[in-house]
UniProtKB/Swiss-Prot annotation:
Phylogenetic classification of the source organism: Bacteria, Pseudomonadati, Pseudomonadota, Gammaproteobacteria, Legionellales
PANTHER family (alphabetical): RIBOSOMAL RNA METHYLTRANSFERASE, RRNA METHYLTRANSFERASE 2, MITOCHONDRIAL
UniProt-recorded name of the protein: Ribosomal RNA large subunit methyltransferase E
Native species: Coxiella burnetii (strain RSA 331 / Henzerling II)
Family: Belongs to the class I-like SAM-binding methyltransferase superfamily. RNA methyltransferase RlmE family.
Primary localization class, coarse: cytoplasm
EC number: 2.1.1.166
Keyword terms: Cytoplasm, Methyltransferase, rRNA processing, S-adenosyl-L-methionine, Transferase
Active site: K162
Amino acid sequence: MTHSKRWLEEHAKDPYVKRAKKEGYPSRAAYKLLEIHQKYKLFKPSMNVIDLGAAPGGWSQVAKDLVGPKGVVIAIDLLPMQSMLDVIFIQGDFNEPEIFNQLEAIVAKKTLTGQVDLVISDMAPNISGIKNVDQSRSLHLVELAWDCAQKLLARGGTFLVKVFQGPGVDRFLINLRPYFNQVKFLKPSASRSRSSEIYILAGEFLGYNQRV
């Protein structure tokens, strides 16, 4: 069985896919974030959040539901995303200066401090089926997400990012730890068991220029 056929069969039988359709989420990924929030209380009312690689919008929808009407959710992705009530969407590459400047300007306009409380990323590379290639590309996306987060995250804030397990992840964690009081790996039950994806949860940001 090819990788594509196996994925399609699993997708059709996946209880989280069925649940997402029933409950109105654009993807099963919403349940990963909900599970993490239930355990670690990521979101609070009135929080300001950036969702990197947001399409199709499952995480943005969860975030907006949890931060409420006074909270701000800014979603960004290369791909288009269906419009969501009270979610600000930017289509583009946040690594490009023009797009990042647009993101920074929105954060400055919508927040009192020009910073956000939470940066989340469920980004994954286009899957080639070659494990080492996919893992390396995933780690690169994580590094880009962190580069963005460190510029816009408020002190005391939280960074949540997906990565595929493999070479370089432990080194990234070592480099990340000095900037946060808490850093841990997570594997939500909504993640497929055979998937190498894990999440890095880094809490209580010390500030990019204030690391210990």
